[in-house]
């Protein structure tokens, strides 16, 4: 039996700097855009404008340098997952589709981050970009807003002022929905949420029918718990990150824009804010941020960042400046 290696044998060669044992690979924007390789631009300026959220300035350069490389990475991971399916079929000795009808298993992506950070735009961009790959053209996007308890139920529970916190969601219904889709079920329904009414739309649903990829976007989708959580079903996840001070500013700027647009709708829940001046609107937005959105970010959302497969870090101009990707 060979003698065990001694400490001197095991020690790495001196390199002048400590080895990097971080679980992440860290890229600046210039390094990340090189990973696009030869991928062509597949979106037009008009499409980017249509996908852009309030207060954001995403353009074709941002798509080319940030989101095309990300689309390529996810595409490669989807292909790898499909190869695993083939390996399972080889083990079973038959096509899983013949042995288990309806066994189509989609690749599930979670997109998380704070209010106003731009996660919805990221999710929409990923949906469109991933649809352009011929090997997985069916990409569905569902937001967790539809799984918020109805306003009446939130009032009954006394948590209307905790809307957006983990306890305000019907976690069991969300988990059941993603489990059903992941299990290959046909025509799985998700509730629809109205930002105008600030509530679920009674009797209205979207139907997800065996997509190649499902994107689940929401504040708390990377939450963990003592039992199975929706994050346990993700094959890949993205966390959209930024400095807290920048997110607060974006939130206030968005609130002012909504005051001049969506809040003016006759049925808008926040119609009473439509006619207030800039100073008052800014004060209201800052109070909402400080009392609700900031505590939720600090207590519940930000701690889940470490669970993401990839972190998009934005600078003050709302554009991605760094990308962190998990090695493991």
From Swiss-Prot:
GO terms for cellular component: cytoplasm. InterPro entries: P-loop_NTPase, PanK, PRK/URK. It is an enzyme of class 2 (transferase). Residues 1-12 have a biased composition (Polar residues). Pathway: Cofactor biosynthesis; coenzyme A biosynthesis; CoA from (R)-pantothenate: step 1/5. It comes from the Bacteria. Residues 1-22 are annotated as: Disordered. Signal peptide: none annotated. GO terms for molecular function: ATP binding; pantothenate kinase activity. Keywords: ATP-binding, Coenzyme A biosynthesis, Cytoplasm, Kinase, Nucleotide-binding, Transferase. GO terms for biological process: coenzyme A biosynthetic process. The keyword Kinase applies. Its EC number is 2.7.1.33. ATP binds at residues 113-120. It is found in: Cytoplasm. NCBIfam families: panK_bact. Belongs to the prokaryotic pantothenate kinase family. This is Pantothenate kinase. It comes from Corynebacterium efficiens (strain DSM 44549 / YS-314 / AJ 12310 / JCM 11189 / NBRC 100395). The lineage of its organism: Bacteria, Bacillati, Actinomycetota, Actinomycetes, Mycobacteriales. The gene is coaA.
